[in-house]
């Protein structure tokens, strides 16, 4: 599945627009790790526990968006975006969304 942030793909034409697709997940940090992160926040440095949580959340949200796109018959997602929001202390939602499309080779480029 091709996923791009642009609205067009060089050498391809959009033969069908299938609409909005999205995937999301909400993740919370383990209380013990949260205490460690609070201490790290005082002394400085990367909060690796949160970084890992957000990386996993992105992967899950994108995977769910791809499942949504495939269910609609898409072979690509254009105008892809990621958004995150805090839903409560220690928990965040990750949302992946874009436009599901069917792309085909643009043979008109070869004719020029």
Swiss-Prot record:
Signal peptide: none annotated. InterPro entries: UPF0145_dom_sf (IPR035439), UPF0145_YbjQ-like (IPR002765). It comes from the Bacteria. It holds the Pfam family YbjQ_1. Belongs to the UPF0145 family. This is UPF0145 protein CD630_17110. It comes from Clostridioides difficile (strain 630).
């Amino acid at each position: 599945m091709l996923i791009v942030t642009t609205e067009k793909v060089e050498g391809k034409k959009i033969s069908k627009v299938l609409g909005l697709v999205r995937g999301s997940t909400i993740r919370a940090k383990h209380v013990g790790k949260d205490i460690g992160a609070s201490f790290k926040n005082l002394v400085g440095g990367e909060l690796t526990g949160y970084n890992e949580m957000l990386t996993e959340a992105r992967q899950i949200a994108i995977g769910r968006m791809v499942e949504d796109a495939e269910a609609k018959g898409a072979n690509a997602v254009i105008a892809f975006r990621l958004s995150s929001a805090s839903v409560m202390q220690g928990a965040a939602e990750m949302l992946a969304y874009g436009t599901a499309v069917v792309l085909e080779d643009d043979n008109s480029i070869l004719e020029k």
